[in-house]
From Swiss-Prot:
Active site: residue positions: C84, H189, E191
Domain of life: Bacteria
Pathway participation: Amino-acid biosynthesis; L-histidine biosynthesis; L-histidine from 5-phospho-alpha-D-ribose 1-diphosphate: step 5/9
Function: IGPS catalyzes the conversion of PRFAR and glutamine to IGP, AICAR and glutamate. The HisH subunit catalyzes the hydrolysis of glutamine to glutamate and ammonia as part of the synthesis of IGP and AICAR. The resulting ammonia molecule is channeled to the active site of HisF.
Compartment(s) where it occurs, according to its Swiss-Prot or TrEMBL record: Cytoplasm
Lineage: Bacteria, Bacillati, Cyanobacteriota, Cyanophyceae, Synechococcales
Species of origin: Synechococcus elongatus (strain ATCC 33912 / PCC 7942 / FACHB-805)
Record InterPro entries: Class_I_gatase-like, GATASE, Imidazole-glycPsynth_HisH
Reaction it catalyzes: 5-[(5-phospho-1-deoxy-D-ribulos-1-ylimino)methylamino]-1-(5-phospho-beta-D-ribosyl)imidazole-4-carboxamide + L-glutamine = D-erythro-1-(imidazol-4-yl)glycerol 3-phosphate + 5-amino-1-(5-phospho-beta-D-ribosyl)imidazole-4-carboxamide + L-glutamate + H(+); L-glutamine + H2O = L-glutamate + NH4(+)
UniProt xrefs under SUPFAM superfamilies: Class I glutamine amidotransferase-like (SSF52317)
A molecular function GO annotation: glutaminase activity
Glutamine amidotransferase type-1 domain ranges (all copies): 6-214
Name of the featured protein: Imidazole glycerol phosphate synthase subunit HisH
BP GO annotations: L-histidine biosynthetic process
Length: 217
């Protein structure tokens, strides 16, 4: 019988981790807040959260020698979830700064274009348009669920098949989530998205537990 899923929550001083940890705990996981590469690589799953600016985030990851461990974790088949800035960092670069991103996924991060009547940042609840309806993150959420967003930049994947959900902000379609194998990432904040957010975190924990069972078997 597999033990409680251990999920490394990467701590690089770019956001409050408490709410996400509570959501993981509620779903039956043991979140481990850590900046230790060995702990990240040994965990059953990894959560990369983050709020703030792209360049300082990459600097913090580099200072903690987390670039290579995150590459390994995200490409190993281990369940991996990025949230908000944690989504953007997975890509190659951002209009917000000069630093290269992690480059795990192809594409760039760009700023919303100004248009009449459009409020930037995109802040508040928005309804997803699911591009990968069978993505495990959407289980038990119903069609086109609502989530809470706060962001000025968004990812533009070079491979359209990466996109798992979009939203509309003004006239601009926005990538709200990506999925490839067991690598998932979302622009919205599950930890601020009430029942839907808790369900999404529970879905991630379910995937971590399933992968853990496969490893044990």
């Amino acid at each position: 019988m597999a033990s409680t899923p251990q999920i490394a929550v990467v701590d690089y001083d770019m956001g409050n981790l408490h709410s996400a940890c509570k959501g993981l705990e509620a779903a039956g996981a043991n979140p481990i807040v850590t900046a230790d590469p060995a702990t990240i690589l040994a965990a059953d799953g990894v959560l990369l959260p983050g709020v703030g600016a792209f360049d300082p985030a990459m600097d913090h990851l580099r200072d903690r020698q987390l670039i290579e461990p995150l590459h390994q974790a995200a490409t190993s088949g281990k369940p991996f979830l990025g949230i908000c800035l944690g989504l953007q960092l997975l890509f190659e670069a951002s209009e917000e700064g000069q630093s290269a991103g992690l480059g795990i996924l192809p594409g760039r991060v760009q700023r919303f274009r100004s248009e009449p009547g459009l409020v930037i940042p995109h802040m508040g609840w928005n309804q997803l348009q699911l591009q990968q309806p069978d993505c495990p993150l959407w289980q038990n959420l119903g069609a086109d669920p609502w989530f809470y967003f706060v962001h000025t930049y968004y990812v533009v994947p070079s491979e359209p098949t990466l996109t798992a959900a979009t939203v509309q902000h003004g006239s601009q379609p926005v990538t709200a989530a990506i999925a490839r194998d067991r690598l998932w990432a979302v622009q919205f904040h599950p930890e601020k998205s009430a029942k839907a957010g808790l369900q999404l975190l529970a879905n991630f924990v379910t995937q971590v537990a399933a992968a853990q069972l496969q490893t044990v078997a």
